[in-house]
Amino acid sequence: MKKRLVSILLVLVMVLGMFPTVAAAADAPTEITSAEEFATMPASGDYILKADIIITAPYGNNFSGTFDGDGHTVTLDITGTANYVGMFKNLTGAAGKTVTVKNVILAGKIDAASRGNVGGIAGFANPYSGPIKIENCKNTATIIAKEKVGGILGSCQSDAN
């Protein structure tokens, strides 16, 4: 009986040892540590920047997630050949979620001299489907554009409702 109990206990320990003892929280943001990770992050996730990065192109088309710069610097080195230029091309409101960009320090330069909708955080913000919040962001970058230009946003569409 004693051998059987020890055997069962040993099997139980071996089986439980196959499972990780520490699991990441399901709602923990994905860490971004490079420009490559920034450029390829899915548009609707939750992210936290864990290192200073240099970006040479805006992020995709429509960002609808949460981005926490965590006090890190994003150096912009962008020459715009199209409209909608910034760290993000567009921030697009999402139903049931507040799109948020916070705690970002911007440096560097955006040169889109013949273009419009150019801003440090985003070229354009459209809160039509849900709210957009930008908080505790600082821009020391030089931004050159033809029209609809701003230190944080190039332009913002008002809610149709």
Stretches found by the model and what they are:
Residues 24-161:
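Surface-exposed repetitive/solenoidal architectures
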Residues 1-10:
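Positively charged n-region of N-terminal signal peptides that target proteins for export
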Residues 16-24:
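C-terminal segment of classical bacterial N-terminal signal peptides
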